Amino acid sequence: MNCLFLFKSKKPRKQQKDNNKNKRKGKELLQNSAPELTNRSETSSFNLQTPRSLPSPRSIKDLYTEREQNLRVFSYEELSKATYVFSRKLVIGEGGFGIVYKGKILSNGDSSDPPLVVAIKKLNRQGLQGHKQWLAEVQFLGVVNHPNVVKLIGYCSEDGETGIERLLVYEYMSNRSLEDHLFPRRSHTLPWKKRLEIMLGAAEGLTYLHDLKVIYRDFKSSNVLLDDQFCPKLSDFGLAREGPDGDNTHVTTARVGTHGYAAPEYVQTGHLRLKSDVYSFGVVLYEIITGRRTIERNKPVAERRLLDWVKEYPADSQRFSMIVDPRLRNNYPAAGARSLAKLADLCLKKNDKERPTMEIVVERLKKIIEESDSEDYPMATTTTKESSQVRRRQVAKPEKQSLRGVSVRG
């Protein structure tokens, strides 16, 4: 990655004119392709600072009217230079509707400032759903502001001779995703406390979305990105949508997302609720407990589906320790792990009305972390023959899985 360089303009005045031209052109293209994005914001700013602090809005609709879309408009040429003409050597993520590159841009468009490392998502021109998701991310991430939601710096929208070009520019997340650390092919193991802290941050991000009456719809370990301090940030908002209004209990929508994480009521009926996200959160809680993916086809039949498998090892049973990630080498608090499994079980209730709100989940996680800090561990090692067999199967090499979406990770 040391080959990255930045193209600096020798004519600052000309560059400023070009930037202003790109800004006007980008806004015009958005007005033509998605007028709902620009009607809610009269200006797109080059300022990369977080939006000004405002009273807590009632919903995301209030944000659309109260805040400007604080986004920078890039030219295609600028982003092409930032990535060495979209070099394959700089690819950090790839999925069905686009590719993510690592690049460097001028900070605030000023060549005198140090370059800014970013993640650039380039939409696949053949992607049927990609353009709609691109618009959704520009619309949503242009106005939200939370430490546990990835920051969108800007976008590019050009219709040129080479065809339609749609790109998004995000802050760069140097520690990739929770998935990359939880299911590694190397020896590194994510410590127990760090797993809890990451899930707490992710829960606070979801709570923020739910306060805005936004349903994330795609919570999974690969969408929880980690910065250089391992602070978690939710990413990929192409599937997010506004929740129900008034007396409505749900919104009905096409069933999309990732198999294994979606709530049963959504899969069966297409009815989407805020607590559909809570279910997905429960799935990831079991992923951090077990160190297993929600679906692993290389396991014995009885163990291929994570949620079916863990039912055989209830949190209150003596056999529970058999499902805890063996890579932790017993360096986790026994009571804390059981409490976390019980919280996951609440999140996974079939009846969504019985699931806790994300606000309650946050409080429970804080309590579990506090109790875990006061508990002595490593816990006693299980030495039964059955436990050894389970653990040997757990450390088997995971199957290679392709990404369904594109994450902003490096």
Curated annotation (Swiss-Prot):
Region of interest called Disordered, as start-end residue ranges on this chain = 11-59, 373-410
Subcellular localization: Cell membrane
The stated induction of this gene product is: Induced by infection with the bacterial pathogen Pseudomonas syringae pv maculicola strain ES4326.
Q: Which function does this protein serve?
A: May be involved in plant defense signaling.
Q: What class of enzyme is it?
A: transferase
List, alphabetically, the PROSITE patterns matched.
Answer: PROTEIN_KINASE_ATP (PS00107), PROTEIN_KINASE_DOM (PS50011), PROTEIN_KINASE_ST (PS00108)
- Pfam families, per database record: PK_Tyr_Ser-Thr (PF07714)
As recorded in UniProt, its EC number(s) are: 2.7.11.1
Topology in the lipid bilayer is annotated as: Lipid-anchor
Q: Can you cite an annotated GO cellular component?
A: plasma membrane
The scientific name of the source species is Arabidopsis thaliana
Polar residues compositional bias: what residue ranges?
Answer: 30-53
Q: Which reaction does it catalyse?
A: L-seryl-[protein] + ATP = O-phospho-L-seryl-[protein] + ADP + H(+); L-threonyl-[protein] + ATP = O-phospho-L-threonyl-[protein] + ADP + H(+)
Q: Cite the entry's keywords alphabetically.
A: ATP-binding, Cell membrane, Kinase, Lipoprotein, Membrane, Nucleotide-binding, Palmitate, Phosphoprotein, Plant defense, Serine/threonine-protein kinase, Transferase
Record lipid sites (S-palmitoyl cysteine): C3
Binding of ATP, residues: I92, G93, E94, G95, G96, F97, G98, I99, V100, K121
Q: Which residues carry this modification: Phosphoserine?
A: S222
Please give the residue positions where the record annotates the modification Phosphotyrosine: Y170, Y266
Q: Where is the active site?
A: D218 (proton acceptor)
Q: Source gene?
A: PBL19
GO molecular function terms listed in the Swiss-Prot or TrEMBL record = ATP binding; protein serine kinase activity; protein serine/threonine kinase activity
The name under which this protein is listed is Probable serine/threonine-protein kinase PBL19
Q: Say which family it is in.
A: Belongs to the protein kinase superfamily. Ser/Thr protein kinase family.
Q: Which residues carry this modification: Phosphothreonine?
A: T253, T258
Domain Protein kinase, by residue range, is 86-369
Fetch the SUPFAM superfamilies from UniProt: Protein kinase-like (PK-like)
Gene Ontology biological-process annotations: innate immune response
